[in-house]
């Protein structure tokens, strides 16, 4: 059995992990991000029982997105509190899993209107390009920052983002939504497109705060702002995406029940 000294030591270690400095808003966003993602996961998963069968998979994907993010935020929180550094590798592992799943939501919403699997693969390929280029731009940035390196890989990453943005607003996703017989789906896809336009645009702000980034050199915004913008963007986009899908599923289910009543 553990003695009182060992138990006190373990208790102190556990408390040290959970201590959030009062003057550190970034640590606060890591903790709240973890709790918000976990709560959203539980909500989306259990709400599957309230929607028609054809919407259950969409809500499951929403729950997976926030659950994967919650797990990574748990470890990113501890990493940040222990080191004070950006958890770049953990963050990009999270994004590599969750961003393609967000593309899956577009496919599932437009599948009934004739979306083919090729659309899904194109969206996933664009998201992978966006993330791989962004990771190279951050993880392999020379010490002290290199503006040319940051800008080059930022532009490459933006190509993937622009493709997804165009597809959601004017391309295949937008056309399939317009051709669907559901006003709910049309409005839902347009709302998700707004998330891609406005919500995803927060990430480049964080990217440009790292050493060598435009905001770092122009305004003196340091690397500590990278995680602040990323954490805010994750909460808005991942939970927001899920809430839009949830709204579509609930509304469509209620309308279907009203028709059959």
Question: What do the predicted segments below correspond to?
Answer:
Residues 142-170:
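Extracellular-loop-to-transmembrane junctions of the mid-late helices
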Residues 69-92, 135-142:
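Helix-loop junctions on the outward
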Residues 51-63, 115-123, 189-192, 260:
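Membrane-interfacial loop-to-transmembrane alpha-helix junctions, especially the N-terminal start
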Residues 167-170, 191-261:
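C-terminal transmembrane-bundle signature of multipass membrane proteins
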Residues 41-48, 77, 93-125, 131-139:
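Internal transmembrane alpha-helix with an interfacial aromatic "cap," most often the third helix
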Residues 39-43, 104-105, 133, 160-183, ...:
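Alpha-helical transmembrane segments in multipass membrane proteins, preferentially the mid-helix core
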Residues 36, 58-76, 199-210:
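Hydrophobic alpha-helical transmembrane segments of multi-pass membrane proteins
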Residues 10-37:
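Hydrophobic transmembrane alpha-helical segments in integral membrane proteins
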């Amino acid at each position: 059995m553990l003695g009182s000294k060992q138990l006190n030591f373990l208790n102190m270690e556990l408390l040290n992990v959970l201590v959030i400095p009062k003057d550190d808003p970034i640590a606060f966003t890591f903790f709240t991000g973890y709790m918000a993602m976990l709560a959203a996961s539980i909500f989306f998963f259990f709400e599957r029982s309230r929607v028609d069968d054809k919407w259950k998979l969409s809500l499951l994907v929403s729950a997976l997105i926030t659950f994967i993010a919650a797990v990574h935020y748990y470890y990113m929180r501890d990493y940040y509190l222990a080191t004070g550094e950006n958890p770049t590798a953990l963050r990009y592992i999270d994004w590599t899993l969750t961003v393609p799943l967000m593309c899956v939501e577009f496919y599932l919403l437009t599948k009934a209107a004739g979306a083919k699997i090729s659309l899904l693969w194109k969206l996933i390929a664009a998201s992978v390009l966006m993330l791989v280029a962004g990771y190279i731009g951050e993880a392999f940035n020379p010490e002290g920052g290199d503006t040319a390196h940051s800008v080059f890989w930022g532009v490459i990453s933006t190509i993937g983002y622009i493709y997804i943005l165009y597809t959601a607003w004017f391309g295949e996703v937008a056309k399939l939504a317009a051709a669907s017989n559901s006003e709910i789906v049309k409005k839902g896809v347009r709302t998700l497109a707004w998330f891609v336009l406005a919500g995803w645009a927060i990430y480049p702000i964080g990217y440009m705060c790292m050493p060598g980034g435009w905001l770092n050199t122009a305004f003196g915004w340091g690397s500590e702002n990278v995680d602040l913008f990323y954490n805010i963007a994750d909460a808005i986009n991942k939970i927001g995406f899920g809430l839009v899908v949830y709204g579509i599923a609930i509304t469509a289910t209620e309308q279907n029940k009203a028709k059959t009543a």
